[in-house]
UniProtKB/Swiss-Prot annotation:
InterPro entries referenced in this protein's UniProt entry, alphabetically: Cyt_P450 (IPR001128), Cyt_P450_CS (IPR017972), Cyt_P450_E_grp-I (IPR002401), Cyt_P450_sf (IPR036396)
Protein name: Cytochrome P450 71B36
Entry EC number(s): 1.14.-.-
Transmembrane stretches, start-end: 1-21
PANTHER family, alphabetized: CYTOCHROME P450 71A9-LIKE ISOFORM X1, CYTOCHROME P450 FAMILY 71 PROTEIN
Coiled coil residues, start to end: none
Keywords associated with the record: Heme, Iron, Membrane, Metal-binding, Monooxygenase, Oxidoreductase, Transmembrane, Transmembrane helix
């Protein structure tokens, strides 16, 4: 009897072991669909000049969850609102860290910032400070006089062009506006007397965006890719940009110590005060390098994104005269006669907000959210996503998903009428600021900049296309790089709106 019982238990154990082994083998095989690649480089050759568009096209064949091999790095790309929800909400804690990337590492003084640092206690404490101190609604509202002053200068500049009948480069105007507002709010000073004038600073920021969006071999071949970066000159370009930014930060610190500034407490004032108070972040005290890394996030995140959105919005409005007429009528009928629209006025401009949402849907400033790194294995659409997988959310593709959006290629702000979808991170159909733990903490600051700048340009001026062009000549080509900016600058002729 004992022998029979022993043999029965042994047989049952063998069956259970075989079933467990088979299940583990099945799990190992449950990888997302993957396009064929080449040895060593994997799928790098399929990225193209505009990776978000290339991967969108691949997702049509291989699905909304797609596995690729970029060099030696296993990478998963998700391209639908449902899979984005699983990544950013349901499995957020499994994959909310960041991969090690050469450009961000150099700019952030070895990951002392909030955008690119890995998920740990240091990051949690830093985010708390940023949310409660730097980007709170109260602090952002304290910068409103700066926005009003700079938008007034923009209105005066465009008015002068209107009186002369000369075209205006709106791409440049919007970039200059966001540079001035961001720098005044961050540093409390203009460029006069600093190591950088406005033009040089804008070029430095442009070059920084360029190398962040450039192919860096060390990001895909950690063991030897740095050699390629040296040979291509990318490493040198990166080092020069970092040194130039560092010199600028140091001069800003000196100006603040001398008290050579005016206005409300800016970001540098706040951070220097926290340094003086010996604020502890993570395992150490706040240092100058911490402050520089945070300032880098403010500059890189604040300057390009708002200008890009305003430029794309004006581009789409010029291509869609019906929408232009409707949004200008709303603004002018609601506001009446004023020298400038205020933030309180903007709360009444519902169609303008729809125009901005529709712009974010078709033209998210960052077509991919900053890549994540998987910290613990999880399942996504029944596929196993292993530890150390690099994960991208293709926001650009989500905005064009026909399963979510009817006629996705049409610019149609009315699709947001009676819709609960907004850009605040709770609706995964629209993710210009991301969602989850790594959502952009400066969302309110960015949104108000776009609303305020765009509303005043639409209120004060009518716009026409330069002589010899038609609406269809205004193209939608995107520039390669970190952000999906308009490749060809938007140049329009302003006409002063006289009824105020």
């Amino acid at each position: 009897m004992a022998t029979i019982l022993f043999l029965s238990l042994l047989f049952l154990s063998c069956i259970l072991l075989a079933a467990f082994t088979h299940k583990k083998r099945q799990q190992h095989q449950r990888k997302p669909p993957s396009p064929p690649g080449f040895p060593i480089i994997g799928n790098l050759h399929q990225l193209g000049e505009l990776p978000h568009q290339s991967l969108w096209r691949l997702s049509k064949k291989y699905g909304h969850v797609m596995l690729l091999k970029f060099g030696s790095i296993p990478t998963v790309v998700v391209s639908s609102s449902e899979t984005a929800k699983q990544v950013l909400k349901i499995h957020d804690l499994h994959c909310c860290s960041r991969p090690s990337l050469a450009g961000p590492r150099a700019l952030s003084y070895n990951y002392l910032d909030i955008a690119f640092s890995p998920f740990d206690d240091y990051w949690k404490e830093l985010r708390r400070i940023c949310v409660q101190e730097l980007f709170s609604v109260k602090r952002v509202q304290s910068f409103q006089p700066i926005k009003e002053d700079e938008v007034k200068k923009l209105i005066d500049s465009v008015s002068e062009s209107a009186s002369q009948g000369t075209p205006v480069n709106l791409s440049e105007k919007f970039t200059s506006l966001t540079v001035r507002v961001t720098c005044k709010a961050t540093f409390g000073v203009n460029f006069q007397g600093t190591v950088l004038n406005s033009d040089r600073f804008e070029k430095l920021i442009h070059d920084t965006y360029l190398f962040l969006g450039s192919f860096s071999a060390s990001d895909y071949f950690p063991n030897g890719g740095w050699i390629i970066d040296w040979l291509t000159g990318l490493h040198g370009q990166r080092e020069r940009s970092v040194r130039a930014l560092d010199a600028f930060y140091e001069q800003m610190f000196d100006l603040h110590k001398q008290g050579n500034k005016e206005g409300v407490e800016d970001f540098v004032d706040l951070l220097l005060r926290l340094e003086k108070e010996e604020t502890v972040i993570g395992y150490g005290k706040l240092t100058r390098n911490h402050i520089k890394a945070i300032l880098m996030n403010v500059l890189i995140g604040g300057i390009g994104t708002s200008a890009i959105t305003m430029t794309w919005a004006m581009t789409e409005l010029m291509r869609n005269p019906r929408v232009m007429k409707k949004v200008q009528s709303e603004i002018r009928n609601q506001i009446g006669k004023k020298s400038m629209i205020t933030l309180d006025d903007i709360d009444q401009l519902h169609y303008l907000k729809m125009v901005i949402n529709e712009t974010w849907r078709l033209h998210p400033p960052s077509p991919f959210l900053i890549p994540r790194q998987v910290m613990s294995e999880f399942e996504l659409n029944d596929y196993v996503i292993p530890v150390k997988t690099r994960l991208y959310v293709n926001v650009w593709a989500i905005g064009r998903d026909p399963d979510t959006w009817k006629d996705p290629e049409e610019f149609l702000p009315e699709r947001f009428v009676n819709s609960s979808i907004d850009a605040k991170g709770q609706h995964f159909e629209l993710l210009p600021f991301g969602s989850g733990r790594r959502m952009c903490p400066a969302m309110y600051m960015g949104t108000t900049m776009v609303e305020f700048g765009l509303a005043n340009m639409l209120y004060h001026f009518d716009w026409k296309i330069p002589v010899g062009m038609v609406a269809e000549d205004i193209d939608l080509e995107e520039s390669p790089g970190l952000n999906a900016s308009k490749k060809n600058e938007l140049v329009l002729v302003p006409l002063k709106y006289l009824d105020h």
